[in-house]
């Protein structure tokens, strides 16, 4: 899969909004990575800056924003633009550094906690949803307890919790 160009997405949103669509959900395996594969400076924040200019667009929702590419430019546009819903779905999966490494995640517990704190401090009325996984191969009792402590401390607005199940390629 490759990211579509900003003009391509803008064209489609304009067409749909002219047909009466008012809410747009941007969904990808990792929406925060959008555009980086094009190697031309395209980012999700830059796409959003174009989409909010479309008159008939009322709401834009963002799904599956992994922490690795959730940068300050993206945070700023989410915070400032009224058309962008103050709801983010960040599938963290775990908080233990040892589990995150085994999952081949690029983020650390420290970087995740820093992002969540920044989200709450910058946009205090934001709704944060996450998905967490337990039972990943090699997860210890200490890893699990660290995850529970983290959940209690962060107080997610919505959360899905699932047990690990092997998938092809994982």
For the regions a protein language model found, what residue spans apply to each?
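Conserved SAM/AdoMet-binding glycine-rich loop
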Residues: 18-144
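Canonical Radical SAM [4Fe-4S] cluster-binding loop centered on the CxxxCxxC motif
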Residues: 1-10
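C-terminal, non-catalytic macromolecule-binding modules
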Residues: 142-170
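ATP/adenylate-binding site constellation spanning eukaryotic-like Ser/Thr protein kinases
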Residues: 6, 89, 161
């Amino acid at each position: 899969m490759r990211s579509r160009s900003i003009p391509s997405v803008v064209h489609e949103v304009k067409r749909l909004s002219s047909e009466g669509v008012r809410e747009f959900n941007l969904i990808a395996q990792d929406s925060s990575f959008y555009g980086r594969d094009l190697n031309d400076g395209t980012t999700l924040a830059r796409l959003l800056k174009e989409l909010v200019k479309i008159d008939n667009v009322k709401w834009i929702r963002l799904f599956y924003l992994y922490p690795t590419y959730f940068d300050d430019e993206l945070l700023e546009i989410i915070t400032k633009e009224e058309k962008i819903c103050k709801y983010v779905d960040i599938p963290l999966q775990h908080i233990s550094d040892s589990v995150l490494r085994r999952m081949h995640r690029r983020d650390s517990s420290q970087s995740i906690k820093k992002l969540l704190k920044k989200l709450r401090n910058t946009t205090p009325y934001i709704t944060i949803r996450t998905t967490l996984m337990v039972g990943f191969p090699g997860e210890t009792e200490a890893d699990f307890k660290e995850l529970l402590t983290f959940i209690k401390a962060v107080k997610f607005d919505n959360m899905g919790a699932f047990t690990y199940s092997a998938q092809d390629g994982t």
